[in-house]
Amino acid sequence: MGKRIVIALGGNALGNNLPEQMIAVKQTARAIVDLIQEGHQVIIAHGNGPQVGMIQKAMAELTRSDPDKYIPCPLSVCVAMSQGYIGYDLQNALREELLDRGISKGVATVLTQVEVDPADPAFIHPTKPIGAFMTREEADRMVAERGYDVIEDAGRGWRRVVASPQPVSIIEIESIRDMVNAGLVVVACGGGGIPVYKTEGHHLKGAAAVIDKDFASCVLAQQVEADTLIILTAVEKVAVNFGKPDQKWLDELTPDQARQYIAEGQFAPGSMLPKVEAAVKFAESAPGRSA
């Protein structure tokens, strides 16, 4: 009998521009449809780190070109935009691959809002990398000119970081669950979900943040009662001593081993750390689950 699988695609694995993304989603669709053909149910989430950074940069440049006409675009709206265009490419690539193999199965992208706590300490200590990699000189200029927070990202360059609060709940979870139970292939929680928090009454207000897609995917996998959570990245495997002469790739880990490596500081915050933490949390959430 097939399993119910949540697949979390890394934003960096989707390419750095639209042509690269088109190629990446076609390759991804083939692998996902292989699983579907084997009888598994698949739900897809994805990151948006490079993409949301590009969107916000473009909107900021537009504002600077005519500040009397345009206003800066809130980060939550940039996340929504990224969900739309990444979901559009993924949805069409999956549909095409399914039809090419003679499989009649619907594909739907859900514009997904995820509730966060406005008092989350992540709003004070930003850790989520977004946008393109920069040299040290470029990063210093962004700090001076725009007041960005930046970090060195796992030896690959410098990036802007923004708040990344923990996901509390998925607003559209009932709709997602209904679609999955009806047999659709669902794309949800893109970019970790549009970050929102509750105000007076039933109003949801966008938050200036990007939720880590690994934690959001963990919540999604739990709430759709998945058997397996698969987190894909731009690197081959999880590693200890990453980027050092004694680097070691890891084929598998127990939750206790993972916690030990976390305590040793082996995994970079905002990069591999949330992936390992999300995998541990999901694997321990119910008997028989794996990540």
Mark where each language-model region is.
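Polyanion-binding loop/helix "lid" in catalytic or ligand-binding cores
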Residues: 23-30, 74-98, 163-180, 186-195, ...
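Glycine-rich beta-alpha junction loops
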Residues: 111-118, 191-194, 235-237
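Ligand-binding beta-strand-loop-alpha-helix segment within the catalytic cores
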Residues: 62-186
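A glycine- and small-aliphatic-rich helix-loop capping segment at beta-alpha/alpha-beta transitions
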Residues: 21-26, 58-69, 124-132, 201-209, ...
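N-terminal glycine-/serine-/threonine-rich phosphate-binding loop
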Residues: 1-45, 54-65, 178-183
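Short beta-strand segments at enzyme active-site cores
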Residues: 6-8, 41-54, 106-111, 186-189, ...
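Acidic, metal-binding active-site segment of PIN/NYN-like and related structure-specific nucleases
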Residues: 222-244
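Short acidic, glycine/serine/threonine-rich loops at helix termini
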Residues: 17-19, 53-58, 119-125, 198-200, ...
